[in-house]
Amino acid sequence: MNELTGQLVQYGQHRQRRSFARIKEVLELPNLIEIQTASYEWFLEEGLREMFRDISPIEDFTGNLSLEFIDYSLGDPKYDVDECKERDVTYAAPLRVKVRLYNKETDEVKEQDVFMGDFPLMTETGTFIINGAERVIVSQLVRSPSVYFHDKTDKNGKKGFGATVIPNRGAWLEYETDAKDVVYVRIDRTRKLPVTVLLRALGFGSDQEIIDIIGDNEYLRNTLEKDNSESTEKALLEIYERLRPGEPPTVESAKSLLYSRFFDAKRYDLANVGRYKMNKKLHIKNRLFNQTIAETLVDPETGEILVEKGTVLDRRTLDKILPYLEDSSKGIGFRTLSQVGGVLEDDVTIQSIKIYAPKDEAQKEINIISNAYIDEEVKNITPADVLSSVSYFFNLLYQVGATDDIDHLGNRRLRSVGELLQNQFRIGLSRMERVVRERMSINDTAAIVPQQLINIRPVIASIKEFFGSSQLSQFMDQTNPLAELTHKRRLSALGPGGLTRERAGFEVRDVHYSHYGRMCPIETPEGPNIGLINSLSSFAKVNKFGFIETPYRRIDHETGQVTDQIDYLTADEEDNYYVAQANSPLNPDGSFANDEVVGRFRGDNTVFNKAQMDYMDVSPKQVVSAATACIPFLENDDSNRALMGANMQRQAVPLLNPEAPFVGTGMEHVDARDSGAAVVAKYDGIVEHVEARSIHVRRIEVVDGKEVKGDLTKYKLQKFIRSNQGTSYNQRPLVKVGERVKPRDILADGPSMEKGELALGRNVLVAFMTWNGFNYEDAVIMSERLVKDDVYTSVHIEEYESESRDTKLGPEEITRDIPNVGEDALRNLDERGIIRIGAEVRDGDILVGKVTPKGVTELTAEERLLHAIFGEKAREVRDTSLRVPHGAGGIILDVKVFNREDGDELPPGVNQLVRAYIVQKRKIRVGDKMAGRHGNKGVISRILPEEDMPFMPDGTPVDIMLNPLGVPSRMNIGQVLELHLGMASRYLGVHMATPVFDGANEEDVWETMEEAGMNRDGKTILYDGRSGEPFDNRVSVGIMYMIKLAHMVDDKLHARSTGPYSLVTQQPLGGKAQFGGQRFGEMEVWALEAYGAAYTLQEILTVKSDDVVGRVKTYEAIVKGESVPEPGVPESFKVLIKELQSLGMDVKMLTVNDEEVELRDLDEEEDLQPADALNIAPQPDTEEEPVESFE
């Protein structure tokens, strides 16, 4: 064993594990939700300021008034986070902006603070609370704005090229070649023009001018031949005709059109990242690399020759002349061109250097033009950019330059919360700007104040719309802490401005070599979203441009040692370096032990000489995400099963008694701490007071080298709160009074946590064996002990609410006095008519008694007399009480009442709101879904009495039997190693940590098993619990960590006798949520036809489905005990006839004797309403599209 292997390592304050890691950790894992918090912080500090700076000043059409936004501040939120959840309001702070109005005529300046709406704040755990619900803003992966070049092959096999200039917002510019070697340009997806037309329009009018700039070549000659415009004016008119067909073109309007499309900073925005990528792509040094220069470069100041003509520019030569190239005062290759009569009047500076075309005998000269390093502040495209991108395109035709891989992470970037919010806020501000301009021109300029000009409605609306209905604003997955953490680290390629599922091809979804250390190759949903929704890798960070960076250890080239200096590299920076694997053997001094090192360079994984290496991986787990890093022996699992394992851990239901895994990976502590489910200390201190609902910590500050006691910090704990998914969210104190805590220590466990570690399931004794065929097809056989001892018992909380509103006929009333309800049904209601806390309820029980006024009918004389005698009481009301829905029930955990009179904020028209929480304790039962961490999932098929389970030689019965046939074909061998190591861990009484790709190997597992006194093969004799006889063969038995998943049979079981019907077809609705029936489909009808079961078939097609009259009469007949009447005509048949008649056909239904059948309507049937007869309200059509979910 390695000296590190088998050492005890402390994870948090309360757990030690024996770690099998061989590689020392050089870098701490970062805070895992930093991607959310840092981005939002940037938005509050910089993003908002940038927005106001962009929009200031707003001037009216005459230029007399100008409105400037000077500064802004955020106030304090009205309610704290818990109150917001309770009251169903948004956690937000008021945004106030300091505005200055300047009147140029009178030189008058007015300043004012303007309230610009409440701005949603991010909680400490990286979520937002919108209308009382916790939501997460998912980061979006989009194409970075830049210039992209690609090659294409036409149908005749001829190779050509295309290029696109993609801005952050604004018009696209595309170049392409055709079969005749002419280069075309498309402006904003319109018809194509020869590219020279665009160059002429920029003010380079004559053929000779263009040839001088771009350099003479056949492609350019072909293009010039195709181009009919001889001058700048003609070119401008031609472009105008293409962009605005049918309008009379003039030179001026063409100039202003082109200006507004490309050169106006308000309309065209490359953003910081676009300018950076553009300058990088068009930079002259990358394009000169390894080319032969065709002119002698001279230092203009000293006259010294830098590079002789005909020199090949390798890395060294380039590095030598780079300072001269980048210094515009030296002027090497810099040219200033004047745009005569073009769109812009200013001169254009470019940098142009001649080289020889590679692989060309005739030594053809090519001009390489760069945009002369445009300043980062210029966010719009410039004529120099256009010239140099056109030049790059012509260079590509001569194999100079490189095409881009659009799936490379150097060309895809993240838009996190801050930027998404900023874009939304920008939309709101620009709508507001329009209003301000209009009001400036209407109102009296002398008396006007800023407040009157500004309408904040559009700003508030755009923010609300973003949080409420954007595809990227999602209801947080709160099933367990891991689900919460993963949701905050999710990267989606979908959403506004991104891809759509249907359009996304195979390449976008595939794993790319640049994902290494940035995006997890394993964790992604199965199904239509595969590869479009990803997870951030564990060590990855996002830089200021939105590119994902991953850390590497730098290798010192002088000494050949791997240093502990960490560099974060983006995907395109990494392309320039050779990177060694994290598990490369090192000498004690940090140099490579072997001459040959396994490493990566771009897409190649091969063996390199150690002298070539530039960097080394930080950790083996930097490849995978937070959830995947929780799978022990990941290296022994097939990737498809590992994907299922990572996804199913997120569906684990928090158990009543959580237990951390015996065999973990060491990530459990980090995931639990950063998820936001635990209570984490903010400061140094000593615990002074611990109780179930709060923990008090006395802060300790260091003053003059001495420790001094400071303020008391109080941490509130959540007890049995309903999570977003209906699981119980409960925190339990972990620390004791007098304990010393440091910042980021865990004070209290959240749900699915034990001793500060993630604990999604339980360690159970598993045998891999069949038992009477009950574990066929991955089914699970379980011992009754797990039910009796509440091993897999979970707590679920449902919330039901009822509101009393004002109706047209009068207000609804919450009361105990409900018509036609016996005293027995009211026994658990208090005097207000609201259920008491602690009552046990079943489905159909009343939770809140409520009556609604019915329409007032004309009273008869007798009724009026009764009214006169007994007063108002006989008023018509109907029972609209809130009842427990089908299949629900449990114990009332809590009741909350909100009254308008008490000053609670309620929606308009609502007087009172009552919320009841029902808690259920669900033991595990047949039909529940279980899984291990290796994608080994199954459904419980049988729960056996403890005495029938097979038992070990010492008499211990096993807990679970799994089918051994589930392992070989699935190739998730990790579960077998976990089984053996888990058993050893139980015997030794030590928890194990086997980190991914750096954990225990077979040898380690065997040695640990021997130390625990087990057989080397991990098998044991088992005895049949029924007969006491031993089984024929020895069986693998061990401890496996098994999880109970959120797919519970209680949520899926459903039955209906009568219920709601669809409005048009009158057929029963479908699905548990609608209390629907089971569809008896086309094939099932064929089956009955084949059997000749005529009466059954007739019933199914009529009275059990949509014969409206028949089903009412049948119901009556069954109730009265009479024989079932003749069925009538199904409603869907009537609908069909009506549809045919609506097409203008005359359709009648005739009997055998050619008499027309009367299709009677229900109304004619003695005014019998089916709903009244069955006591069921008719349901509206619920055949809408299902709501789009993100899995």
UniProtKB/Swiss-Prot annotation:
UniProt-annotated stretches for the region Disordered: 1164-1191
Keywords attached to this entry: DNA-directed RNA polymerase, Nucleotidyltransferase, Transcription, Transferase
Name this protein carries in UniProt: DNA-directed RNA polymerase subunit beta
Superkingdom per UniProt: Bacteria
Keyword Protease: no
EC number annotated for this UniProt entry: 2.7.7.6
Gene that this polypeptide is encoded by: rpoB
Subunit structure: The RNAP catalytic core consists of 2 alpha, 1 beta, 1 beta' and 1 omega subunit. When a sigma factor is associated with the core the holoenzyme is formed, which can initiate transcription.
Family the UniProt entry places it in: Belongs to the RNA polymerase beta chain family.
GO annotation, cellular component aspect: DNA-directed RNA polymerase complex
Listed GO biological process terms: DNA-templated transcription
UniProt xrefs under PANTHER family: DNA-DIRECTED RNA POLYMERASE I SUBUNIT 2
Main EC class the enzyme belongs to: transferase
